[in-house]
Amino acid sequence: MTKVLIPSSGPNDWKGFLAQPDLHWRTGYSARSLAHCWEAASGLPIEVADIMAGAFGAPMLLFAVPEHKTMLPGGTRESQSDIFALVRHERGLASYTIEGKVEEPFGETVADWSRNASGGKIERLSYLCSMLGLAECAPEVRYQLLHRTVSALIEAERFNASFAGMIVHSFSPACRRFEDFALFVKLLGGGDIQPGQAVVIDTPSGRPLALGWACGDQSFLRA
């Protein structure tokens, strides 16, 4: 894949980067809602900026890349973040992975994903846990949350950023799937978390890691 990027001319440019455009690019679904929300913002959507500010101080978006792929050990399949954002704070650079949601689940639990695991899967899970300072991972945690969060740390290393973060940008009126996210945050030692709140945890790399659940403007569900 080329490393040359070109500016977006609008939300519809995002469609072509989806793994299954005809399936996922639909009104009321996260991919389309997320694209319209971020394109409408002057920089960062306010609900996302608030979480970033709560973690590391006032943020300024440098650039955002839809459907950004991050290589992981233990196989050839990358972690594909809905958005990768490089952000400047007064205290330094931060890399963020953004996971868009409406009603969609976070996918398999670690227990399901690792059942009859190949050597590659065992290697990958061990790597993900080590990056987050976990001796082992609770089987009920969603695997997607693990690799999406570690992707932010990998990109922070690549860009020599001081901080990293993973934010779920949800447009669900009922905050569907929040309980999966809250369980993940607690596993990492972040305690109890509420929507709209930032939690910052320490990581073995020495980079502080922010986690948050941003409640998106539901008008974008109609976009």
What are these regions (language model features)?
Residues Q144-A223:
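Non-catalytic C-terminal interaction segments of nucleic acid-processing enzymes
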